[in-house]
């Protein structure tokens, strides 16, 4: 349904949008990217959703917002000459399928069998290999592995917490990394569900810290979300945001 809607949008607004795939998942689903605006613009903004499978409601939100933006495109034509939006409505399409339909939604027999053994579909966050994509990025990943080893923890594929054998082991992670490196965006907004909070302070030095504070403050003015303290933003590593901040300085 999302793929159909994206193609419909791209056909309806051919001069304003561009639809492309960042790659395919383990169950052969596309990771779609919809460009809105001038691809040569100096300012590039990425908005992504559903990196955690059970948070697929954000996909519906981002799709609706995209349609609203395009309907009002004419009023902001000058802005879109200098700014380009890249909409990633579903980072984890395999996981979303599992969250919505259980193991039966997965077409690959080997993957489906492993997923059936894991269960917990109503709380499923991970991809089709039972890996949490949002803890699979190369930013503090090895440090967390060392902590687990010290505590004697042996993790394996599951519905919510498994981070993978190594950093960037997953197709979805690699696709996101490759995409960010290719377009070098100024800002990335990573949408999640529940909490009504903003994770923004990753204990980095200025001017990046000041930029993050300004952006979070502007968002707070509009949605009244609570800005979380530094300690809450640095408890876990290997996240998409961790990698964006520490490795790409975004």
Report the location of each language-model feature.
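Short glycine- and acidic-rich boundary segments immediately preceding or forming the N-terminal edge
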Residues: 1-27
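Surface-exposed patches in mature extracellular/periplasmic domains of secreted proteins
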Residues: 18-23, 74-83, 227-232
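Proline/glycine-enriched tight loop/beta-turn segments at coil->beta junctions
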Residues: 29, 38-44
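Short beta-strand element of the alpha/beta-hydrolase
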Residues: 42-52
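Active-site/substrate-binding loop(s) of hydrolase catalytic cores
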Residues: 42-43, 56-202, 208
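Active-site neighborhood of phospho(di)ester-bond hydrolases with catalytic His/Asp-centered motifs
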Residues: 48-49, 88-90, 188-191, 224-231
